[in-house]
Amino acid sequence: MSKLPAVLQQLKFPVIASPLFIISNPKLVIAQCKAGVVGSMPALNARPAEQLEEWLIEITEALAAHNLAHPDKPAAPFAINQIVHKSNDRLEHDMALCVKYKVPIIITSLGAREDVNAAAHSYGGIVLHDIINNKFAKKAIEKGADGLVAVAAGAGGHAGVKSPFALIQEIREWFDGPIALSGAIANGGAILAAQAMGADFAYIGSAFIATQEARAAEEYKQAIVDASSDDIVYSNLFTGVHGNYLAPSIRKAGLDPENLPESDASKMNFGGDAKKAWKDIWGCGQGIGAIDKVQSTAELVARLKREYAEAKASLLVA
């Protein structure tokens, strides 16, 4: 068994909702936590920067009120994603607010920094760092991260190319802390499979785009419902980092999904212009074949829980 920090031990369902750039907002995060999964959002979704404090207040107060009203069914903790890349000139400001409001979980991406980890630890928070290979995993833990988000092939948005079997196996050879697995997980059976191969949690993103609370265009939500894994394109053109995107949105932008040029990774920018790259090019993972309708977050999580229980039961019968 993995050694889990106290904040993760309290989770009754092994799911962390991934932070969705532009799409995640307090409404979605609160709904996710109330449904029993870790809700998360990127700090950079709050624009201007001052809005982040308003959002943190909204989330913490809503979850506190829920826990007071439902002591027998407390909300799951929430997480804030920080882009630890040199182009993010808001990092220090945003981390200071996370410290002020004692955000339970910090998810770091695109760079591991000891000072960011120390800031989270200063108030008892934990840090999960997302990685795409074993080399980056070791660096993250060496710099003080408490756990890892293993971003395997098929994940929506920024994604790696490693098979989840290979990635989890290599990390588990030396690391016994918390691991969340990301990559084409959109039903309860896949959540159980992630645990079976050595992960503690499933890290799910694309399925939450097609929810009523998500801050995504209705066309985007419907495109996810209508699409399958055949409609996913892997490219680094849009942000400088390789990721998975819906082909129809690429065509709509006047580009050929089959012939996209390579981008210069040195020109990655997660500052003020970053939002433009994601506005009309829709990130999405390969697991969307399991998404057949737009529904509430509570309904989605209820489906995942039901499928998870059914998958467990079927294995016991076999």
What are these regions (language model features)?
Residues P164-A180, A186-A318:
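Conserved active-site-proximal phosphate/metal-binding subdomains
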Residues M1-H158, K162-P178:
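Active-site entrance/lid segments in N-terminal catalytic domains of soluble metabolic enzymes
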